[in-house]
Each structure stands twice: as C-alpha cells, then as structure tokens.
Amino acid sequence: MTSEQTLLVLGIETTCDETAAAVVERRADGSGRILSNIVRSQTDEHAPFGGVVPEIAARAHVDLLDGIVARAMREAGTGFPELSGVAAAAGPGLIGGVIVGLTTAKAIALVHNTPLIAVNHLEAHALTPRLTDATEFPYCLFLASGGHTQIVAVRGVGDYVRLGTTVDDAIGEAFDKIAKMLGLPYPGGPQVERAAASGDAVRFAFPRPMLGRPDANFSLSGLKTAVRNEASRLTPLEPQDINDLCAGFQAAVLDSMADRLTSGLRLFRERFGAPKALVAAGGVAANQAIRRALREVAAKAQTTLIVPPPALCTDNGAMIAWAGAERLALGLTDSMDAAPRARWLLDANATAPGKFANTRAGF
C-alpha cells in the first residue's frame, strides 16, 4: 500500500468501556471520509459500580463486538474483501478489552488476507484532526481523557514528543473522582460540568496547581484534596453546596489548564517553531467550559484551535481506522504476533516527570 492509493480501513476500539467499529476511507490526497462509525457505550453496565469494572468491560466487548463490526460494515456498504486493512487499538488500555479487539482484528485480517495495523490508542486521538480538519504537521496536541493528560508535539505519523503530562491524576479521572465524592451519578465528568453551570465558582478559594512553573506538567491531587476537605467540612451537603464545589473545582482546573498549555505552547515554539494549530482531543474536550478556555488560550497564543466534534473526541472506531489508514499509507503494518499492551507510551523516549524537579531556576 502507498499514499497514492485510496485506502479503505476497518477500525476496532475496545480499550475501555466503548465497543466501537468504523470504516474510513483515506484518499490519495490525504483527505478522509467516515463511511460508518458505530459506538456502543457500556455506561449502563458500569453505572451500578460507579466506575469501569475491567472484567465486566471485557465480557461486554466479547458479547457486543461481532455485531458492532457487522453493523459498521453494513452501513459502510462494503465487504471484508474490499478492505485495504484492518486496524485495532492494541493499547494502552484495559488489557482484557484490548485482547478482545485485537484478536478480532487479527481473525478478520487472517481470513481475508488483509494487512493488520496495531494502533496506539493515543496516536489515534493525536491524528483525528487530520481526518476532521486536514490539519498539517506539526501541531500541538492537548490530550485529556479519563486516563491521560498530555501536551504533545505531533510532528508526523509515528513522530511524537511529549512536552508535558500529569504527575498524578488525569483531568478526566479527577472529574470522575470529584463526582463520586459528591454523590453524583456515573459517568461523573458531564455531571460535574452540569452542576458547575449552576454554581458559584468563587465561593471556595481552591488552589491552582503548578501555576507559573516553566515546565508543562499537570497536578490535580492537591486540588482534589482541597475539594474533599471543603465537602467534609460542609457535610451534610445541600444541592447548592454541590453546585458551588463543582464550579470552584472546574474553575481551578480551567485556570491550571490554561497556564500549563501556555507553557506547553512556549516549549513547542522553542523546540519546533510555531505550531500549525492547537488541537484538543480526548473525552474531556467535550466539556464546553474547557472548550471556551481553550479558545482563549489559542487566541492569546495567536494560533488556530481545532477541536474535533464531540463524538470524535471520545473513544470511537473512526479514529482507530484513520490512524490505521495513515500508517498503512506509509507502508506500516503489523504481523500476527502484535501484542496487546496495557501500557504504551506515545513518545517512546518520554520519562516519568518529577513533581518538584526543575521547577524554577535555583530551586
């Protein structure tokens, strides 16, 4: 396969609690088109437990995936023999679910003698704006989800440099934990956003973690503790208390995020020149308050903000299919020995950040 061909790729996503499959077309000029994109959320299965249960997720993927793939192929109006490749998220994620998706992709590829592409789930998020907006390299990616918070220089397919990451909780994880702490239903992120809209963001003086540091790392554990302490002090909580706590928490996250992104964009410019865009991806990018804050950051940095539609920010099969197509266009395929991975760094050279290392000159 070469970049001069039109490619048709099936993508499978099973890394967490969405069972998804999609068919995407990548044209010779590098543009793309989604032919189908089927996502089945497992929210109902996990809601009684207040979070994702890995074994339940894996079993649900087993039960659902064949039907989801069949529907994706049917809606795309194509058959397996017409596919140029089969892509599956091979990690990072909950290993049981990753095994289900990757094994299914291998079976399809083997039976139909079709190339297999084992996709890094994070790379799929990183490349989505090239599908939705034909974004050119290099660009600065803000990836924020329940499991990841990273600022990444995206220089090309397979070429990523992590500029910043969280030293403790991911942003989406923190939203979910605050929701659970305050007794809000699962999934917690949208519930916190909804409550915050009716709250007083200045009632509580919550900390803004990492503000003013020259690096681009995040930390949310101290903020989470501050919210817990206020909630404990006010117990029993009135509905307005919950709204105000959510509003104060979200405002602190927005201030911290804006500061960290400003540092990340500065680091990007110092190392790689001006980015073609600031791109936001991951489920957290569906939060409208976060989108507004991102627009302000991009405007101050005099760069373009690109945020894919909400359905393509959260986990989906189209992003896996597109990443597979991008890799396939470069001749990058995988053997049947491709292993599922619970952990898989986007930047293979990245190291764990030190929470208080190299924070200020002379510190």
Curated annotation (Swiss-Prot):
Cofactor: how and how many bound: Binds 1 Fe(2+) ion per subunit.
* CDD domains reported in the protein's UniProt record: ASKHA_NBD_TsaD_bac
**Signal peptide residues on this chain, from the entry's feature table:** none
Q: Which cofactor does it need?
A: Fe(2+)
Pfam families per the UniProt record, alphabetical: TsaD
Give, as one word, the top-level EC class.
Answer: transferase
Question: Where is the protein situated, by its record's location annotation?
Answer: Cytoplasm
Query: Which cysteine-cysteine pairs are annotated as disulfide bonds in the entry?
Result: none
Q: What is its EC number?
A: 2.3.1.234
The reaction(s) catalysed by this protein are: L-threonylcarbamoyladenylate + adenosine(37) in tRNA = N(6)-L-threonylcarbamoyladenosine(37) in tRNA + AMP + H(+)
User: Where along the chain is substrate bound?
Assistant: 143-147, 176, 189, 287
- Provide the binding site for Fe cation: 121, 125, 315
Keywords attached to this entry? Acyltransferase, Cytoplasm, Iron, Metal-binding, Transferase, tRNA processing
Which GO molecular function annotation, any one, does this entry have?
A: N(6)-L-threonylcarbamoyladenine synthase activity
An annotated GO cellular component of this protein is: cytoplasm
Q: Which GO terms describe its biological process?
A: tRNA threonylcarbamoyladenosine modification
Any idea what job this protein has?
Required for the formation of a threonylcarbamoyl group on adenosine at position 37 (t(6)A37) in tRNAs that read codons beginning with adenine. Is involved in the transfer of the threonylcarbamoyl moiety of threonylcarbamoyl-AMP (TC-AMP) to the N6 group of A37, together with TsaE and TsaB. TsaD likely plays a direct catalytic role in this reaction.
Which family is this sequence assigned to?
Answer: Belongs to the KAE1 / TsaD family.
Q: NCBIfam families from the entry?
A: gcp_kae1, T6A_TsaD_YgjD
Record's PANTHER family?
TRNA N6-ADENOSINE THREONYLCARBAMOYLTRANSFERASE, TRNA N6-ADENOSINE THREONYLCARBAMOYLTRANSFERASE, MITOCHONDRIAL
The name on file for this protein is tRNA N6-adenosine threonylcarbamoyltransferase
Its source organism is Rhodopseudomonas palustris (strain HaA2)
> What lineage is this protein's organism placed in?
Bacteria, Pseudomonadati, Pseudomonadota, Alphaproteobacteria, Hyphomicrobiales
